[in-house]
Amino acid sequence: MLCHRIAKGFMGHADSRDMLEIEIKAPCKDLVKLEKNLVKLGARDFGTLVQADVYYAHPARDFGKTDEALRVRTENDLTVITYKGPKLDQDSKTREELEVSVANVGTISSILERLGFRPVLKVAKRRKVYGLRGVSVCLDRVDGLGDYVEFEYEGEELEAGKAIIKRLMGDLGVEGNERRSYLELILAQGRN
């Protein structure tokens, strides 16, 4: 969600409270080539972020079974806590996301732990953000996983949003679709 929030301020999106955030992610073999293709198509560069995400386990239910997540993300001076609901379809990573900025990562972590939540895993990544055709394109280098590209579009209609993203993916030569989160991918590596 943060990727899209950075870019949407520059792309003229209205208030997004009733909008869906439609996401499709794919592995990327060559981030440099993809970045060059984005620039050729006229994408706007919104900069590079270094993100550290800590995912938490609920004290009374298994988020793995309910397809939910609770994440505390830190980047630069910003800390955001995000609840992610179950995925809404079989093709994308689209899900309800509720988030709020917090002033202090240490305080929010202590609050969660005192409530019985426990940290499960930390995911660190370097994210380069572009905007093109109303889509946020995030080029991610994830520690321990490799390179991915994530497309995010905000709109009222799921199918229309997926079509916009898939058209852009085709124009960029991006294939594949990884519905699992970075957390799920890292946890799966540990099971193999």
Model-derived regions: residue spans:
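N-terminal strand-loop-strand beta-hairpin
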Residues: 16-134, 171-192
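Residues forming anionic-ligand binding surfaces in small-molecule and nucleic-acid pockets
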Residues: 84, 142-148
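Short beta-strand/turn micro-motifs at beta-sheet edges
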Residues: 137-139
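Long, well-ordered alpha-helical scaffolding segments within enzyme catalytic domains
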Residues: 159-176
